[in-house]
Amino acid sequence: MKKEKAIVVFSGGQDSTTCLLWALKEFEEVETVTFHYNQRHSQEVEVAKSIAEKLGVKNHLLDMSLLNQLAPNALTRNDIEIEVKDGELPSTFVPGRNLVFLSFASILAYQIGARHIITGVCETDFSGYPDCRDEFVKSCNVTVNLAMEKPFVIHTPLMWLNKAETWKLADELGALDFVKNNTLTCYNGIIADGCGECPACHLRSKGYEEYMVMKGERA
């Protein structure tokens, strides 16, 4: 364990919760930051707060409602249908979201004396979001370091993991059931197994079933 401080970009979903559990194993002191941008499932904020409390971690909540105004899409508006069309970005793409989140997480890290910033983005289950790519995160890391003259390190523990491997990591951290039962991934705001219909639920459940097969608990 590194005797350093870290901050986790935290939504209360499967990926960011797994990253938080990973960070708690890796760093002596960990805090979280959650962004409220009037997202489609607003209970995300409450779920993040609840999980942070259960794990004994401080949660910072930042009001990013301007993002909703700037980037209306299916993730921020209930009247926009969730859909994925061939050759186009998904309707849930929020332009610049991770750029904004990592920038503000870095500012907060500067203020609280944290060198390490953790985010749950990944390329393997790439949903078509350009700001989930490894090259974007590395570029952002260089930018925030130059902007604040600090040696921040942005960690992406899930970058090269698919959903089955993300479940495996949660299991290795001793928290498979915790992640399965407490996190909110569903675009329709249903905790744990979700609605079973939206793209996020399909990806989550498919990964879980694949991991159960890998583990030998499914035929």
From Swiss-Prot:
Pfam families assigned? QueC
One BP annotation, GO: queuosine biosynthetic process
EC number per UniProt: 6.3.4.20
* UniProt binding sites for ATP: 10-20
- Any one GO molecular function term: ATP binding
Alphabetical keyword list: ATP-binding, Ligase, Metal-binding, Nucleotide-binding, Queuosine biosynthesis, Zinc
Q: Which family does it belong to?
A: Belongs to the QueC family.
- NCBIfam families assigned to the protein according to its UniProt record, in alphabetical order: 7-cyano-7-deazaguanine synthase QueC
| Protein name from the UniProt record | 7-cyano-7-deazaguanine synthase
Source organism per UniProt: Bacillus subtilis (strain 168)
